Structures are given as C-alpha cells and as structure tokens.
UniProtKB/Swiss-Prot annotation:
Pathway: Amino-acid biosynthesis; L-leucine biosynthesis; L-leucine from 3-methyl-2-oxobutanoate: step 2/4. Heterodimer of LeuC and LeuD. It comes from Acidiphilium cryptum (strain JF-5). PANTHER family: 3-ISOPROPYLMALATE DEHYDRATASE, HOMOACONITASE, MITOCHONDRIAL-RELATED. This is 3-isopropylmalate dehydratase large subunit. It catalyses: (2R,3S)-3-isopropylmalate = (2S)-2-isopropylmalate. Its cofactor is [4Fe-4S] cluster.
Amino acid sequence: MASTLFDKIWAAHVVDRMPDGTAVLYIDRHLVHEVTSPQAFEGLRMAGRKVRRVDATIAVADHNVPTEDRAAGIAEPESALQVATLEQNVAAFGVPYIPVTDARQGIVHVIGPEQGISLPGMTIVCGDSHTSTHGAMGALAFGIGTSEVEHVLATQTLLQKPAKNMLVRVDGTLPPGCSAKDIVLAIIGEIGTAGGTGHVIEYAGEAIRALDMAGRMTVCNMSIEAGARAGLIAPDETTFEYVRGRPYAPKGEALERAIDYWKTLASDEGAQYDRVVTIDASALVPQVTWGTSPETVVPITGHVPDPAAEPDAGRRAQMERMLQYMDLAPGQALKGTKIDAVFIGSCTNSRIEDLRVAAGIVRGKKVAGHVRAMVVPGSGLVKAQAEAEGLAQVFLDAGFEWREAGCSMCLGMNPDKLKPGERCASTSNRNFEGRQGPGGRTHLVSPAMAAASAITGALADPREMA
C-alpha cells in the first residue's frame, strides 16, 4: 500500500503496538532545555534511574538566558535557578551540554539542525512546542510534556497514537517581497489554529521545494500554530547539501549510505491523506497578524476585520476582545499602524538567511526615532557569521541593538520584554496576550516586514523599501 512520509518514519520507529492502537515509539534524538526538564530529571533521581542514551540526548539553555551583559549573570531568581538546575542535572546524569559560554550556544531549534544533530528520517522530541521546526529536515519532530521528557530520558521511547495525515501543497512561485513566513502565516490564516488538530502536516509543492533550509524551518516551526502535531518536508538535494559537513552528521561513505536511504523518504504516488489543502504562492502578498491568535492574518494591504460582520456570537465576542487588547479599530488599515518596537529573532526567523534579508532592507537607512529595534541571532555561530559578513554592522549603523543568542523577546521569560501597551512587529511565532510581556501587543511578520517597519516606524510593506 502506498505510504506517506509520516507513515514511513512512524513505521520505522514502532517498537510495539497495544490493542488500542497506541505505539511504543523509539526516539532518535532528545533535545533538552532548562524550562521543561527540572522535574523530569528529579523524577529519574527519585526512581534511581539513569538516562538511557546520553549519546542521543543534548541540552542547552535558551529561554531564560539574557541576550546582553551576560557577564552579570541572570538577574531574575527563578530564571537563574532553572539554568543552574539544568547545569547540575546534565553534570549528574552525564548528558552532553552546550553551556551559555559556548560559541555554539543558542536556541535549541536553531542549533539542532545547525550542528547536524537533527537528520532526515529521525524521530526528534523536546519539551517545547516548536520542536516541529526539525521537520524541515524530513524528520518526525514534535513537542512533549515534562512527564514525557522523563519517560524519554529513562527509556528512549514514548507512548503515542498515530496522527492523521494532512497535505498542504503550496504551488506557484513566491512573488518578490514574500517569504516562507508569509507562506505559513497564510496557511494558518486559511485553515485556522485548529485546522491541523490531530494531524501531521506534510508541506509540498513548487514553492516549498524552492525554499532554502531556513525557509523550510520557518514553515515547519509554525505547524503547531495550525494545531498540528508536527510538520515535515520530504528531504531532497537541498537537505542533503545542508547536512553535509555538519559536526554531528555522518561523514564520507556513511553519509552517502545515509543519503541513499534518505532518498526513500518521500510519500509514495497514490498515498492517501485525510485532508488536502492547496495554497497558490503566486497570489500571496506580505502577511501580518492583527489580533491575539496566529490565525488573525491579513495582507499588509488589508484592513482590520469588523466583528459586526461575524455571524457567530462567540467568535464575534472574541474578535471584539482582541481589538480592545490590540487597540485597533474595525476597518483600520494595518499598513501605517504605528509601532514601538521591532524584534528580529526567535526559532522562527533568526538564522543567517533571515538576517541577510533584514540587513538588505535596512542598509544605509535609520531606525525611526521612536522605535526600539533589536536583532537576536539564533545561535552564537549565526552571530559570528553575521558579524563576519558585515551584517551586524549594518544593523548597528541603522540603530538596531545587536544581541547575544537566545529566545529573547519571543516570550516574556527573560529581560527582553515589551512594556504594557507597546506595539511590536515581531518575527516570532505567537501573538497571544502578554506573550512578549504583560500588556504587550504583537504583530507577527516576516524579517523583511520587521526591517521595513523599523525604518518607517509603522507596519510597512517591504515591497516598497527597494
């Protein structure tokens, strides 16, 4: 029977099946950070267990680490405790760790592919929603809870029920000014934040194949915002060339044998999907969110919708609450809406390719006087490369803050926060109430739109910044 990519990876990792369909699934890679691991390690300690495969586990601190003045340490006591606890646990259990002082340190979902830890055909888990990022490698990657983190540490397996298959085909060619972020925002706007519930999304089509690995990671990263369990893209020559030479990747003949296998990781002709969605990339324009859910997407040329036109009372009330929180009016144009801050970073858009796009827009220009703008590279290696290419100086000359690697303003767990009422054009993945700080207002955008908005001081169409 014809199989999907998800079916193939799943079948290759099932250790055992239970009568109700639950599978014991083998896990190839376990990524660990400071937020969801403390109780998991403590559970091992109390049960007298060891980490079953330290060689398949790697840890890094990213959520709580400051992105400036690291010599001063972490000021917030709870954040400092989480990082210190992670360091104690990895030392006690022998888990490989990339410390904050390491040149490779960064966001776990950036360094996994960057180091060649994440590879095609693998099952990859982490106690973090955006583990779906690694699906860009052609891997089955998904977030897990703290109790599951403990289970994987102890057994290298998980109890999982198989998901449904969903295909999102993105045909056509992306127009100038549009990017992978616009693709995934448009998808979420089309199917909603519950559209992928119970499914693993496979992204395919001409526009997906044309994306570089950074773009593919952006798309897979936000699969969870569509409600999906995971998102993945079949590996191809773009993937293989990206993997080649990575520190943890196979070398020489071992790599060539691996590539021969990875070439089989594609959905068979005639494979059946439970749901199929088609998007025309050529019709896209740069996207921006207006509300407090990633599905509240409109083109930058569009307007805030009017709740009065919504027939469902519950949805209408939700829209009214969003507009009140975001301080927007029905019918208001998004383009030209004044902003206070710009954040270029996060596991969605902090790779060197993202920074090149943003730097290309701000080169020779200045950040608007009332805007606080920052660029936070996804890893120390991205930071070093951006500095070597002169991108960091472009940002500094324009008036951006240039920071150390970390999750930063994506979430309010470190010093990088919005003040109440501040409006931010952000390349991150979530725009919930208070996500970037209590009372902060977040508009999800691409790196190009974030850069353009920093210069104009308002939400801007990057196509007009040539």
